[in-house]
Design a protein with these regions (language model features):
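Conserved beta-loop-beta/alpha segment of the NTase-like Rossmann-fold superfamily
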Residues: 64-66, 72-142
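Short amphipathic helix/loop within the catalytic HATPase_c
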Residues: 61
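N-terminal glycine-rich phosphate-binding loop and ensuing alpha1 helix
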Residues: 1-58, 67, 72, 106, ...
Length: 142
């Protein structure tokens, strides 16, 4: 999940370079995920950062993975739920997965774009998902 502005960080840490050649943290995860066998990535972002995110990450990633976008919007809630007065932030991980639901067509994994997991984590989850399915492709949601 790639969301948007980090309130404590003071910017969009998901697209700020950290590597020696300008890599962002999610570049390392995407590399590991692709090597493990994941072919599709769904970025869950806010509409406000769409252009900047695509320019910094999405356009480049689309050369090696199938890239889809889902947009987490505060007012898109399951029936019976309402937004509390004064709430301005998205709802978190479950809400992000709900926003990505139309793009998910099989087993999937969820990670945060600003965390590093390492290659073994992707291998383990891909191996599990690909052996416990009906042959559907696996997807990673960021």
């Amino acid at each position: 999940m790639a969301a948007g502005m980090g309130s404590r960080y003071g910017g969009m840490k998901q697209i700020d370079p950290v590597g020696p050649c300008g890599q962002v943290i999610v570049d390392y995860s995407l590399y590991d995920a692709r090597r493990a066998g994941f072919e599709t990535v769904i970025f869950v972002i806010k509409h406000e950062i769409e252009e900047a995110f695509k320019a910094a990450i999405g356009d480049r990633v689309s050369k090696v993975m199938d890239v889809k976008y889902a947009f987490q919007q505060l007012d898109e809630l399951p029936e019976g739920y309402t937004i509390p007065e004064g709430r301005v932030k998205p709802w978190g991980t479950c809400h992000a997965v709900l926003a990505a639901k139309p793009c998910i067509h099989g087993p999937f994994a969820v990670i945060n774009a600003d965390d590093y997991y390492g290659p073994e984590a992707f291998k383990v989850i891909y191996d599990y998902l690909s052996t416990h399915t009906d042959g559907e492709s696996t997807t990673t949601v960021w």
